[in-house]
């Protein structure tokens, strides 16, 4: 291959820029032309595509968000949208594509492969909800953002003797809540994989108060309930003043951690290596310390295994 393209799609994640940088620099190193697609799959449909060079990706490894911008494309899910995208790809002579994003983006990459365009999927989502890889780009940064928020909220919670419920992202996957709760020393962690027992949470809060605890931190994944509604219920049942904090899109922003920059750089470079060999229909990821790649269909068919051992550990450490 001599001409490839890179896009970022779906929700943004810290480290996407580092992945784009790795794709562009690895491609140019191997004498490829690298095109940047703006606004995700919409950019393929609307021909929002421009050639990138070394200057295009200078000073971006430390930046959050994505310089290519991103979007969720309903049109690309239609046959007409796919026809338009395929026409643009052929007119521009693009031979392969690197798609960076979450589950929907990986499914978009699968569609491109089915249309005859070799495409590699790179996992970029703070939710860490792609089963085939241990970690996704952006997850580590998001966890660190939440841990920082926990520390700040604990300060004011202690001063006022309150309980605080901190709602974090994770509709179907509780990894952010789990790991941030462990690292932040939360008293209770509520995730969609396990569900919620409000009475159990209340009993733990009351036991802590009996021992003289001045604060209580509860981490709630958004898919397991509403922090606002739960705070009202807990306050009614315990008599402890309970406040809710919804971190929202704060978790998607900020400079990526060293771990996310390293992961993104390795995965972006591996994606280019595969395209150099005219290999498509693959995703890249990480198992332990090893960068891996596998068939997209196999990757998408895998079911996430919740880390129940770590969850049980948090219950032991939060007594």
From Swiss-Prot:
Subunit organization: Homotetramer.
Catalyzed reaction equations: beta-D-fructose 6-phosphate + ATP = beta-D-fructose 1,6-bisphosphate + ADP + H(+)
Keyword Kinase: yes
Record's subcellular location: Cytoplasm
Pfam families in UniProt: PFK (PF00365)
Enzyme kind, highest EC tier: transferase
CC cofactor: Mg(2+)
Binding site for ADP: 21-25, 154, 185-187, 211, 213-215
NCBIfam families: PFKA_ATP, PRK03202.1
GO cellular component, one term: 6-phosphofructokinase complex
UniProt GO MF annotations: 6-phosphofructokinase activity; AMP binding; ATP binding; fructose-6-phosphate binding; identical protein binding; metal ion binding; monosaccharide binding
GO biological process assignments: canonical glycolysis; fructose 1,6-bisphosphate metabolic process; fructose 6-phosphate metabolic process
Annotated binding of Mg(2+), by residue: 103
Active site residues of this protein: 127
Keywords, comma-separated and alphabetical: Allosteric enzyme, ATP-binding, Cytoplasm, Glycolysis, Kinase, Magnesium, Metal-binding, Nucleotide-binding, Transferase
Taxonomy, superkingdom: Bacteria
Binding site for ATP: 11, 72-73, 102-105
Principal cellular location given in the protein's record: cytoplasm
Similarity section: Belongs to the phosphofructokinase type A (PFKA) family. ATP-dependent PFK group I subfamily. Prokaryotic clade 'B1' sub-subfamily.
Binding site for substrate: 125-127, 162, 169-171, 222, 243, 249-252
Keyword Nucleotide-binding in record: yes
Listed name of the protein: ATP-dependent 6-phosphofructokinase
Native source organism of the sequence: Alkaliphilus oremlandii (strain OhILAs)
InterPro entries associated with the record: ATP_PFK, ATP_PFK_prok-type, PFKA_ATP_prok, Phosphofructokinase_CS, Phosphofructokinase_dom, PKF_sf
Cited function: Catalyzes the phosphorylation of D-fructose 6-phosphate to fructose 1,6-bisphosphate by ATP, the first committing step of glycolysis.
Pathway note: Carbohydrate degradation; glycolysis; D-glyceraldehyde 3-phosphate and glycerone phosphate from D-glucose: step 3/4
């Amino acid at each position: 291959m001599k001409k490839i393209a890179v896009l970022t799609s779906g929700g943004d994640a810290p480290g996407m820029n580092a992945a784009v940088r790795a794709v562009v620099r690895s491609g140019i190193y191997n004498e490829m032309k690298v095109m940047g697609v703006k606004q995700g799959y919409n950019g393929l449909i609307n021909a929002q595509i421009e050639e990138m060079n070394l200057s295009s990706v200078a000073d971006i490894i430390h930046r959050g968000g994505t310089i290519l911008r991103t979007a969720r494309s309903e049109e690309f899910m239609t046959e007409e949208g796919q026809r338009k995208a395929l026409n643009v790809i052929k007119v521009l002579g693009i031979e392969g594509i690197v798609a960076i994003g979450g589950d929907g983006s990986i499914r978009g990459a699968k569609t491109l492969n089915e249309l005859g365009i070799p495409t590699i999927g790179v996992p970029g989502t703070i939710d860490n909800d792609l089963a085939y890889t241990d970690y996704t780009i952006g997850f580590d940064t998001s966890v660190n953002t939440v841990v920082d928020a926990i520390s700040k909220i604990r300060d004011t919670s202690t001063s006022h003797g309150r309980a605080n419920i901190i709602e974090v992202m994770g509709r179907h996957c509780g990894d952010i809540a789990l790991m941030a709760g462990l690292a932040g020393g939360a008293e209770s962690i509520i995730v969609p994989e396990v569900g919620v027992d409000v009475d159990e949470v209340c009993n733990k809060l009351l036991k802590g108060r009996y021992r003289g605890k001045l604060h209580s931190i509860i981490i709630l994944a958004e898919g397991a309930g509403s922090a606002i509604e739960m705070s009202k219920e807990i306050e009614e049942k315990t008599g402890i003043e309970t406040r809710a904090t919804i971190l929202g899109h704060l978790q998607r922003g900020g400079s990526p951690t060293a771990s996310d920059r390293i992961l993104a750089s390795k995965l972006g470079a591996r994606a280019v290596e595969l395209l150099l060999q005219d290999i498509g229909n693959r995703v890249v990821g990480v198992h332990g310390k090893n960068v891996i790649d596998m068939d997209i269909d196999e990757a998408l068919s895998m079911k996430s295994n919740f880390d129940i051992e770590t969850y049980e550990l948090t219950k032991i450490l939060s007594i």
